[in-house]
Structures are given as C-alpha cells and as structure tokens.
Amino acid sequence: MCIRDSLGTAVQRIADNSNVKGMIYTVGNEQDYHFKVLFKILKRLGYDWADNLYHLSYGMVDLPSGKMKSREGTVVDADDLIYDLINTVKQTTESLEKYQSSNEVLNHDEYRKIALGALKYYILKVDPKKNILFNPEESIDLTGNTGPFIQYAYVRIQSILKKVNKDVDINMNYTLNEKEKEVIKTIHEYPSIIYNSYKDLSPALLANYLYDLVKSYNSLYQNYHILNSESSDSTSIRLIISINTSHVIESCSDLLGIELPNKM
C-alpha cells in the first residue's frame, strides 16, 4: 500500500463526509506498520480526527492448499471461491438421502445464501487477530460450528411456527425445565453481547453467541416435543421460546451480514 494514496484518501473521505469524526480500517495484519505510519503523519499534519482512526488488524485467511501470495500467483479470486462453494453446497445437499426423498427443491438463490453464510460465518467466528485456515468442506458441515448449522436451525423453527394458527397464551405458574431455562437465559444475554461486540470491535463474539443460542435451542428440541408436548402450557412456552429464538437468529445474522434461506 502507498502512504501517499492512503493520505489523500483519508483526507478526502473526511472532507466528503463532514459528520464523520473517525474511521476504522479493517485490513490484514500485514499492513500494521503502514497504518501506524499513516496515522502518525495525519496527526503531525494537524488533523484533529487523526486520533479517531483505528486499524482493526485482521489475521490473514489461508486455504488448505497453502498461504495466498499475490507475487507468486497463488491468490484465489473471491468470485471463484464463492462460485465453487455454491456448487459444493449444491452437490452436498443433493447427495443427502433426506433431500432426495423430499419434495423440497432449493433454487440458486438459496444455495447462494447457504454458501455465503458458510464463508462469512467461518471467518467471523474467529477472533480478528488470529489467522484463519478456511476449509470449504468444513464450513458447510450441518453439525458443527458453521453458518449452515445456524441457518438450518432457523429454517426448522420457521417450519414449526408455520403449523401454529392461533395466539399463544402463557401460564405464568408454569415451571420451566432446565432446557427451557437455558434457552431463555441465552436469549436474555443478547443485548450485552451486542454491546461487548461493539466495544471490543469483535464480530466473533456475536457469531459464537449465535452458535451457543442455536445449540441451546437444539438441545431443547431434541429432548422435548415443541408442538405435541405433554401439556398445552408446555407447548405454549416452547412456542414462545421458539419465536424469540427465531427473532434473535434473524437479528444477529443481520448484524453479521448473513442471509437466512427459506428452506434447506
């Protein structure tokens, strides 16, 4: 990167956006020295907003084939990576027995959402300062800490809620079981997770919170019936939990820039 170009760009950005008082540069850690020098020069030139410039130093992303180096021609084009990942998602999905026996047919847009969700989540779940080894096959695993795992849970919740055609009433005297308590507790933590993610400039906090929420809900789902449960009171509380879990998944995914498919 050229200091001269970066100086001009920084000054022009502030000039074009007078309400902006600072900037966060999300750039790989190989440019740490560049930004240290850039910020120092801007401060010496007397720009008072220079104190509000911050380099969010990101770890480098490598592939299983090795480190990407532009000078050696080993850089993978992002469009090519996304295209290949979409095809991998499509092939993997169509090979599943439950997909072959289902009437559900996924379109290209849904495959795209799953592939991009896998890519974004795989990167965002890692602390920004750490290097990332992106494994395409691992990123689309439906049982691990992945974007598709979260997307699938969301689709399943939506499928449950579509079967409900009446208002849900809660019995305030209902005694929650441990699984229900755990999901409610995790939902309650969401606002503080947003704040900490903002304070620490770490989307990884949001991403891993989302995974924990889905794991907690899945544990409830696997151990207890949601719709045809042991009583109308338990059905009602689990539907309320499902609705609120769905809302948090939507909100958190939106903050992470991850789209949610309608079916999987």
Can you annotate each of these PLM segments?
Residues 4-264:
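Non-catalytic interaction-recognition regions
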